[in-house]
Amino acid sequence: MQPTMEAKHISSVWGIPVWRTASLAAFLWAFSARGLAQQQTPPEGPSTPSAKAPSSAPAEFAQARKLTQQGKLDEAIAELQSIESRDPSTKGLALEMGAAYYKKSDFPKAIEYLKKATKADPANSEATQLLGLSYYLGGHPAEAIPLLEKVQGWYSRANVDAAYILGICYIQTKNYDQARHAFAKMFDVPQDSAASYLFTARMLLRQEYDPVAEEYARKAVTLDPKLPLVHFLLGELYLFKSRVPEAIAEFQKELAINPGHAATYYKLADAYSRVQRFEEAERVLQRSIWLDATSTGPYILMGKVLEKKGEFDLAVRALQRAATMDPNNPTTHHLLGQAFRDMGKEEEAESELKLAEELQTKQNPR
């Protein structure tokens, strides 16, 4: 399994950083529940979904649900286990147990109980979708696919988050065309359009399926040479792979058709800075900032470029601006420390470098 760009140095489960699985599970829970609640047409099958809103939950589950809402998942599970010990056949218990373990990010246990829930009621959309998500988050995309496909097949307008997860599962099982179909549905564009290839290329790049991402982006260019953001994506890919001349060429092509895109100027400046074309980097960074003064990245890169040019006062001003916008970015303070040291201001340098180290330790505890 290849690591993702976002989690290159973080242990991951199928492209999801381990430290993020709990929050992602909660996020997907919230949106899957909302998506199911918004559906108007019941699924086809032997029965309608048996999942009920918390307000109509059986009395025996009320305490467990209250504990869950308070974030006391272990206590909620213990409460459900006491019900299980008294009567393992209690209707709806398997779904309650599976949902509790899902929220706890204990996906093997969630799968165990959610399989029971779907066996008892194959048309229970909540149990089916949670089981699919549990398989995905637990690192079993192949098992997740048929369940998420089933949920999508039940409804004319499937939950967007489920469509995204389904597309990622297709990528992880190397079924790229099916992934494209899922993302086309997610973004409401034709399956064979340039946009569908662009969206799929973006998702492939995020998962670091670089050769396929490049292939799909090139297909998008073939279908629509003036489609915005295709050359930007290719530029990002080449920059990530340190193919700097190719990255520069792609960013320049993007600006020719999309001259108001601030991020392209920023990425082009990054590419210029890597080959020490600092004057050009400074010029396009100014354009990026003029177009979007709310992003810290261009200010940070401007500080680095100006420091390389020996313009330390201006570098400090750019970096201080970035620090004002985002005081908790350790990179900004580290660069400020370097700039102050270049200026001979040792006291200010030590203060910034110490703060950078503290922020780095706080954000990445070992």
Where are each of the predicted segments found?
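Terminal, low-structured helical/coil segments at or just beyond the last alpha-helical repeat
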Residues: P42-T48, T331-R366
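Alpha-helical segment of the N-proximal tetratricopeptide repeat
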Residues: S56-S89, A99, K103, I168, ...
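Helix-start (N-cap) detector for alpha-helical repeat units in TPR-like alpha-solenoids
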Residues: A57, K91-G92, S125-E126, A158-D161, ...
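Structural signature of tandem alpha-helical TPR/SEL1-like repeats
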Residues: Q70-A78, K104-K116, G138-K150, T173-K185, ...
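Structural marker of alpha-solenoid helical repeat scaffolds
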Residues: R86, A120, G153-Y155, D188-V189, ...
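Canonical tetratricopeptide repeat
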Residues: E96, L130, Y164-I165, F199, ...
